[in-house]
Amino acid sequence: MNVDFLCSLPRAGNTLLGSIINQNKNLNVTANTILADIIYQLHLLKKNEIFLNFPDEKSLNNVIKNSFNNYYKDWEAEFIIDRGPWGTPDNLKILKSIIKNPKFIILNRPPLECLASYIQIEQPKN
């Protein structure tokens, strides 16, 4: 299994890209996953009183590093593009400690266009 990452603004074309790529059974783009949050919460355990009482950082790092394999264990695709908030500073730092050279797909759509697309779908039909 090979995991890469999709980080883009909402309404930038993530769903369209995912629906095109997901036509290939060997390649899957996820919906917005909770994996980034799972790994972040595991990382926060390093500040927990129970952990600090017996700081076995190596074992906790093993759990964190195996999160990707465990989360995607039942996925049949060889390549997975995880769509989540991996570009935030804390998530990116943790991700780089797990995967040395993570690869990102970033869809570039001007932020004002993304915002305008929200307004367009929320506008009353009258």
Segments from the language model and where they lie:
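Short amphipathic alpha-helical segments and helix-helix/interface helices
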Residues: 18, 69, 92-96
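Residue-level detector of alpha-helix boundary/anchor positions
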Residues: 73-74, 101
